[in-house]
């Protein structure tokens, strides 16, 4: 799925040394799964390498990544949007690990020599933070996606509440309310409210009520679509910030009205003062002139 040369920037000459022999990882890891390949479980390469005491090395010249001296198949690897590299369990098995599934299929024990670690097939849930305009997706306790979003603007606010993903899920949905507008990587949340991709996603509410994810960069919209399963809980909470209304408060100077009588009196006083001052100036000038 990803070519190894592209992984070079992230794993440039990276080598993880083995921990002391005999160590056993007592804590488990929450794995990552995807809706378009639901039976495959992934785990971050660096985490599993440390847990099993395996070396991980990227050869810059050949563009190949090895784990426990096994060259990984780049076509089987995935990434989180933050660049974290994920390796599937079958690649771990080819690298020399023993894979043992639990009876309920919700956990797998990965072992190598005297080291072992449990990887959980944890549940997924999504949190939409209206106040901070963020979408965070979790698998178990693992944060797998943290992206800025844009929700419903004033008059079209995104409703808070507890929802479930679906039932509509489409790589290209069309809006029935807004002139057949394209909504790529759409996941329905509630009635006409969808999580979907959009070209420009400002970090403030600007949509007609939907939750917009960026298509640019690592494409969080597509990543979320590939990851989320129908029926998984989606929590929308908080209140959109007041600043999201895109209005700026400008100080306004208000002239206080002056009653007509007071205004006339003021003018008379000013005129009188000016006249007196002028007369005094003329008197002083005339007096000095007569002395000369």
Can you say where each PLM-predicted feature lies in the sequence?
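Bacterial N-terminal signal peptides that target proteins for export
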Residues: 1-8
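Exported/periplasmic cell-wall-interacting domains
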Residues: 157-160, 172-270
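Extracytoplasmic
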Residues: 40, 60-62, 121-123, 130-132, ...
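A structural motif detector for short, solvent-exposed N-terminal "entry" segments of globular domains
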Residues: 112-154
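Bacterial N-terminal signal peptides
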Residues: 8-19
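C-terminal membrane-anchoring or membrane-association module
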Residues: 278-292
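Extracytoplasmic/secreted envelope proteins and their assembly/folding machinery
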Residues: 42-49, 89, 132, 146, ...
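Primary recognition of N-terminal secretory signal peptides and signal-anchoring hydrophobic helices
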Residues: 21-123
């Amino acid at each position: 799925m990803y070519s190894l040369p592209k992984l070079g920037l992230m794993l440039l000459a990276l080598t993880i040394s083995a921990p002391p022999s005999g160590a056993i990882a007592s804590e488990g890891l929450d794995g990552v799964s995807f809706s378009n390949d639901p039976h495959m479980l992934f785990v971050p390469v660096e985490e599993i390498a440390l847990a099993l005491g395996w070396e991980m090395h990227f050869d810059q010249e050949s563009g190949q990544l090895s784990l426990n001296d096994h060259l990984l198949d780049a076509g089987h690897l995935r990434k989180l949007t933050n660049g974290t590299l994920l390796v599937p369990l079958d690649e771990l098995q080819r690298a020399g690990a023993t894979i043992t599934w639990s009876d309920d299929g919700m956990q797998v024990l990965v072992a190598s020599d005297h080291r072992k670690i449990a990887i959980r097939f944890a549940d997924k849930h999504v949190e939409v933070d209206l106040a901070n305009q963020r979408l965070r997706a979790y698998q178990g306790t693992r944060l797998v996606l943290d992206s800025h979003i844009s929700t419903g603007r004033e008059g079209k606010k995104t409703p808070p509440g507890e929802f479930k993903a679906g039932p509509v899920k489409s790589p290209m949905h069309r809006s029935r309310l807004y002139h057949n507008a394209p909504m790529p990587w759409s996941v329905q949340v509630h009635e006409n409210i969808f999580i979907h991709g959009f070209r420009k996603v400002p970090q403030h509410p600007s949509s007609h009520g939907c939750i917009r994810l960026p298509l640019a960069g690592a494409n969080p919209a597509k990543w979320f679509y590939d990851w989320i399963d129908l029926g998984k809980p989606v929590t929308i909470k908080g209140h959109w910030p007041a600043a999201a209304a895109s209005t700026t408060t400008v100080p306004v100077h208000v002239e206080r009205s002056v009653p007509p009588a007071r205004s006339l009196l003021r003018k008379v006083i000013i005129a009188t003062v000016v006249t007196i001052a002028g007369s005094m100036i003329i008197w002083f000038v005339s007096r000095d002139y007569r002395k000369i």
